[in-house]
C-alpha cells in the first residue's frame, strides 16, 4: 500500500483519467447548453403555440433535463453492472452526442410544426438518460483503476468535469456571440455550439474505444461473482438499500444544494435579482470557475490523507454559516444602489389570506392571476423587499404601500378584458412610487406613433409633455408593416395606413432596474464567486470516491448512480425555482438561501452521525 501511495501515475492510469474525464466534460457541456440557450430554443420551438401548449412543452423539457436523470441511472447502472463499465459509458456518450448534435440541426416549429417541440423534448429526454448513466460509469471506472490510497485523487479529476463542462459551454457561447453579433446569434448562431459537439464526440469515442475494462469488474466476472439482478440486489435488499439512503441523505443531498448554489443559483442571483448584465455575469462566473476548479483535485488528494467525511462535512458547515453574508456581499458589489435601497425601502402588501399563493415556477412560464400574486410577483421580479399582511377583506384587491403611496392591484381573471391596461397602470404607479422613494429605477425612452401621441401625453401627466412641441421636433417616419412588427400599432390600428411619424420621447417608457456597469465591482464579485466555488469543490471533490467505496463491485455502478442523480437531479435541480419561490413568498431576496442551508444542515447531521469513513476500504475485497 505504501508503494502504491508514493508511486507516480502510470501512462495507463493517465489515459484512464483523461479518457473518462474528457467524455464526461463533453456530456456536461452538452447538458448545460440547453439551459444556457433556453431563451433561443424557446423562441425557435415553442413560441408559435398557445400559452397552455407552450407551458406543457416547457415543463416537459425541464422535466426531461433533471427529473429523468435517475431513470438513466437505473437503466445504465444495471447495464454497467451486468456487461461492464467500458461499453456502458461508451453507449451513454454516443446517445448524448447524437441527441445534442441533432438539436443543432432540428428545424423550428415554423418549418415542421408541432413535430419540432416533440422531437426536441425526446432528444432532451435522451440527454437526461445518458447523463444519468455517464457519471456513475466514469467514477466507478476510474476508482477501480486507482491504486489503494489514491482513489480520492484519481476520481477528483472526474469531479472537475461538471464545472469544466459549464465553463466550456459559457466560453463557446460567448465566443460565438462575439463573432456573429446578437441578431445573427439569436436567429441561427445559437445552433453552432450544439453542432460543435460533434468534434468533442468524435475525439471522446475514439479514446474510449481504446480503453480496457475495469480490472475490478473483469476479476469479478472471471470469478463468476457478478450480480444477475443489480437493481433488485441494490435496492430490494435492505442492507444495500440502507447504504443508498445513507449515501443520499448523508452526503449527496448536501453536496447537491451546495453545488447548485455555488454555480447556478449564484449566476441566477447576479442576473435575475441584482440585474447585472448577462454577458458580464457569465464572464464573472467563468473566471471564478477557472480560479476554483483546481481545488477539486486538491480536496480529492487531501481526502486520501485525512478522509472523505471531514472535508465534505466542513464544506457543508462553511456554506451554512456564510451563505447569507456572501450573497449580501454580492449585492453590495454587483448593485450598490439596490443594496442601499434594500436597507431603506420596504413595501407592504395587504391582501385577503386566500389571495396569496406559493409561487413555484420551475419552467418560468406560470401565470399568477390573483391580485396578491400579481403584486408580489412584480415586486419580486424587481428585487423589492416587502411584507405581506393578510388582513384584507375577501373579494377586495390587494394593495401595495410604498412610503405614503398606496396602489391597488387587480385580479387578472375577474378583469380579463381590461387586464392588460390594468397591469400597465399598476406597474407604472408602483414604479413611480418606488422611484420617488429612492429606488434605483431607470426609465427608458418611449417610441410613440403619431396616432397615439395625444393619448400618451394625457396618460403620463407626471412627464409634463406638450404634444404640439413633440410634433414640431424630431421624428422618424415608419412604414405600416414596421409599426406592426415593432408592436407600436396593432394590425387593426394600421389598416389603411401607409406610413406614420414616430416620436422618441426620452425617459418616458418602461421602468427597469439595471445594475450600473460603472459601479459593478468585478474583482469583488469574482472573489465571492470563487469562495462559493471552493465550497463546491470541498463537498464535490471527494464524493465520487466516497460513493464508490460505499458499494461492492457487483452493484457499484447501480448503487452509486441512483442516489447521486436523485440528489443532484431533484434536490439540486429544483433549487433555483424553489429558492426563488421562497423569496417571493417572504419578500426577501435572500430568503431562498434557507433551502440550501436547511438541506445542507440535514446532511451534516446525518453524515456526522451515521456516514462511515471509507478512505481505507479495499474496494476489491468488498465482494
Regions found by a protein language model. Give the residues of each.
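Extracytoplasmic gate region of multi-pass secondary transporters
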Residues: 34-35, 240-288, 327, 354-389, ...
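Cytoplasmic membrane-interface "Motif A"-like loop-to-helix N-cap segments
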Residues: 82-94, 305-316
Amino acid at each position: 500500500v505504501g508503494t502504491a501511495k508514493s508511486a507516480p501515475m502510470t501512462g495507463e492510469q493517465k489515459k484512464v483519467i483523461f479518457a473518462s474525464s474528457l467524455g464526461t466534460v463533453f456530456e456536461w457541456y452538452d447538458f448545460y447548453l440547453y439551459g444556457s440557450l433556453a431563451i433561443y430554443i424557446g423562441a425557435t420551438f415553442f413560441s408559435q403555440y398557445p400559452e397552455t401548449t407552450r407551458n406543457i412543452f416547457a415543463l416537459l423539457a425541464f422535466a426531461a433535463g433533471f427529473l429523468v436523470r435517475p431513470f438513466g441511472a437505473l437503466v445504465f447502472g444495471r447495464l454497467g453492472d451486468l456487461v461492464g463499465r467500458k461499453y456502458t459509458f461508451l453507449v451513454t456518450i454516443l446517445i448524448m452526442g447524437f441527441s445534442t448534435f441533432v438539436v443543432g440541426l432540428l428545424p423550428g416549429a415554423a418549418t415542421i410544426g408541432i413535430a419540432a417541440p416533440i422531437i426536441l423534448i425526446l432528444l432532451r429526454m435522451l440527454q437526461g438518460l445518458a447523463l444519468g448513466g455517464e457519471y456513475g460509469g466514469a467514477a466507478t471506472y476510474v476508482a477501480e483503476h486507482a491504486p489503494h490510497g489514491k482513489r480520492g485523487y484519481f476520481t477528483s479529476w472526474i469531479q472537475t468535469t461538471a464545472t469544466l463542462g459549464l465553463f466550456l459551454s459559457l466560453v463557446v457561447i460567448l465566443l460565438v456571440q462575439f463573432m456573429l453579433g446578437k441578431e445573427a446569434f439569436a436567429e441561427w448562431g445559437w445552433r453552432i455550439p450544439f453542432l460543435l459537439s460533434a468534434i468533442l464526440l468524435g475525439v471522446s469515442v475514439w479514446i474510449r474505444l481504446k480503453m480496457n475494462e475495469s480490472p475490478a469488474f473483469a476479476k469479478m466476472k472471471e470469478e463468476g461473482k457478478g450480480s444477475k439482478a443489480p437493481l433488485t440486489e441494490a435496492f430490494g435488499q435492505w442492507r444495500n438499500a440502507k447504504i443508498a439512503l445513507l449515501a443520499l441523505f448523508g452526503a449527496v443531498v448536501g453536496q447537491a444544494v451546495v453545488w447548485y448554489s455555488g454555480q447556478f443559483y449564484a449566476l441566477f442571483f447576479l442576473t435575475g435579482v441584482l440585474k447585472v448584465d448577462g454577458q458580464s455575469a457569465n464572464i464573472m462566473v467563468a473566471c471564478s470557475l477557472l480560479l476554483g476548479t483546481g481545488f477539486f483535485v486538491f480536496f480529492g488528494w487531501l481526502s486520501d490523507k485525512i478522509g472523505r467525511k471531514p472535508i465534505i462535512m466542513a464544506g457543508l458547515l462553511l456554506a451554512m454559516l456564510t451563505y447569507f453574508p456572501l450573497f449580501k456581499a454580492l449585492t453590495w458589489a454587483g448593485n450598490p444602489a439596490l443594496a442601499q435601497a434594500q436597507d431603506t425601502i420596504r413595501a407592504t402588501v395587504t391582501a385577503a389570506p386566500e389571495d396569496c399563493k406559493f409561487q413555484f415556477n420551475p419552467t418560468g412560464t406560470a401565470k399568477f392571476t390573483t391580485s396578491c400574486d400579481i403584486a408580489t410577483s412584480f415586486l419580486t421580479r424587481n428585487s423589492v423587499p416587502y411584507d405581506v399582511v393578510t388582513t384584507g377583506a375577501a373579494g377586495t384587491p390587494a394593495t401595495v404601500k410604498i412610503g405614503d403611496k398606496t396602489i391597488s392591484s387587480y385580479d387578472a381573471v375577474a378583469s380579463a378584458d381590461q387586464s392588460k391596461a390594468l397591469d400597465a397602470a399598476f406597474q407604472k404607479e408602483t414604479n413611480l412610487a418606488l422611484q420617488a422613494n429612492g429606488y434605483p429605477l431607470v426609465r427608458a425612452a418611449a417610441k410613440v406613433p403619431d396616432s397615439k401621441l395625444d393619448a400618451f401625453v394625457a396618460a403620463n401627466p407626471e412627464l409634463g409633455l406638450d404634444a404640439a412641441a413633440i410634433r414640431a421636433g424630431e421624428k422618424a417616419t415608419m412604414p405600416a408593416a414596421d409599426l406592426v412588427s415593432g408592436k407600436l400599432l396593432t394590425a387593426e390600428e394600421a389598416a389603411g395606413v401607409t406610413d406614420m411619424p414616430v416620436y422618441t420621447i426620452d425617459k418616458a417608457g418602461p421602468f427597469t432596474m439595471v445594475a450600473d456597469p460603472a459601479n459593478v465591482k468585478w474583482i469583488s464579485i469574482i472573489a465571492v464567486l470563487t469562495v462559493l466555488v471552493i465550497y463546491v469543490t470541498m463537498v464535490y471533490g471527494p464524493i465520487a470516491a466516497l460513493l464508490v467505496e460505499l458499494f461492492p463491485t457487483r452493484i457499484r455502478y447501480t448503487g452509486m448512480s441512483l442516489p447521486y442523480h436523485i440528489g443532484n437531479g431533484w434536490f439540486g435541480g429544483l433549487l433555483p425555482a424553489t429558492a426563488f419561490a421562497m423569496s417571493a413568498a417572504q419578500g426577501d431576496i435572500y430568503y431562498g438561501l434557507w433551502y440550501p442551508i436547511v438541506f445542507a444542515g440535514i446532511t451534516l447531521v446525518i453524515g456526522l452521525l451515521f456516514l462511515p469513513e471509507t478512505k481505507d476500504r479495499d474496494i476489491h475485497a468488498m465482494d
